[in-house]
């Protein structure tokens, strides 16, 4: 896209928004403040596709058998909050997973509470609760790694599925690391056509 000097004025700040179907909305700020002469501004952007598969949220860890979101991990959700703010028509599922220790029932309950704790935090930060779905998967969906992970001198390679049998085949000190990789919270886009409630007319309600 190109904007001419009849559209861009001196000493102004502009917000550029890029929308494309099946891509996350991208925004940038461009300022002409301080420009003394007319000049060209060239910007190149790479926009991200909305993934079909769940995205693991980094650095969200829990104490053993606990579900409260620890304050030191709240920064990990900042990028997700910004994404939801810029993309108001997206709804997401927050799915939480446990390792395979403890009973199936206990893991289902624990993972649901962990997923809900993340949803609750997002709501506190101003995200519409109708855009969020908490889902606990317990231990039923072992993680498949999309990159190599290293623990000391041991490498768990990309493509590995962290099943119970696989983890039990690892050296003892690596097993705990693999269990930690399985304990995770992910987000998945489940719809792209949500209408914010303030934009719903009386006839639609």
Predicted regions and their residues:
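Periplasmic peptidoglycan-binding/tethering modules of Gram-negative envelope proteins
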Residues: 1-91, 130, 176, 180, ...
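Conserved phosphate/oxyanion-binding catalytic-loop motifs
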Residues: 94
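Periplasmic OmpA-like peptidoglycan-binding domain that tethers envelope proteins to the cell wall
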Residues: 97-205
